Amino acid sequence: MGAEKITSKIMEDAKIQANVILAEAQKEKEALIKKAHEEAEKKKQAILKKGEKDAEMTRNRILAEARLSAKKNSLEERERTIAKAIQKLEEDLVKLPQKDEYKDILLKMIITGVYSVGGGELDLQLNKNDWKLIDDSTLWALEKEMEDRLKKVTVLKKGESLPIIGGCVVKTADKTKVSDNSLEATFERNLDIIRAKIAEMLF
């Protein structure tokens, strides 16, 4: 084999080798590019997934806050409505002594007070206007009725006038037992029941 042929053979082998190297390099390049694309896609999906998760969390938080705020506003509005209704009842309570049926109500409150302390020698306290409704004959009739019911001598003495809207306060003579049946005290004692009934009617 001549020098020229040897040189040609070397050049041909070198070219083949170079082409093999270039092909492998191209494959590696393409593999790296593909891997880079895959990595980028994975990162993209991860970012999108995190974004979706964050967005969902933000949405849920906003909805929860909105529901909480709506519930709070509803409760506040409910309380305002109940408060207005109670205020109206308090205004009506002040006007109750002016009504025709008030004397019967007052007599029942006195009887309840006498029952509560158990009869005996008692002090009856009213406001100034109500003493005009309860004269001596009415007191005597009340005493007789309570004696018959309690089977116990009962004496109702006129006590001091009180600055109350209406109703009565009944005390034993030794002041060991007191029944506050004033309109305002009765209203206050039953306020929870009143609130519940208002809520039941309105809501």
Swiss-Prot record:
Keywords: ATP synthesis, Cell membrane, Hydrogen ion transport, Ion transport, Membrane, Transport. InterPro entries: ATP_synth_B-like_membr_sf (IPR028987), ATPase_E_C (IPR038495), ATPase_V1_Esu (IPR002842). HAMAP family: ATP_synth_E_arch. GO terms for cellular component: plasma membrane; proton-transporting two-sector ATPase complex, catalytic domain. It comes from the Archaea. GO terms for biological process: proton motive force-driven plasma membrane ATP synthesis. Its main location: membrane. The lineage of its organism: Archaea, Methanobacteriati, Methanobacteriota, Methanomada group, Methanococci. Pfam families: vATP-synt_E. Component of the A-type ATP synthase that produces ATP from ADP in the presence of a proton gradient across the membrane. This is A-type ATP synthase subunit E. Has multiple subunits with at least A(3), B(3), C, D, E, F, H, I and proteolipid K(x).
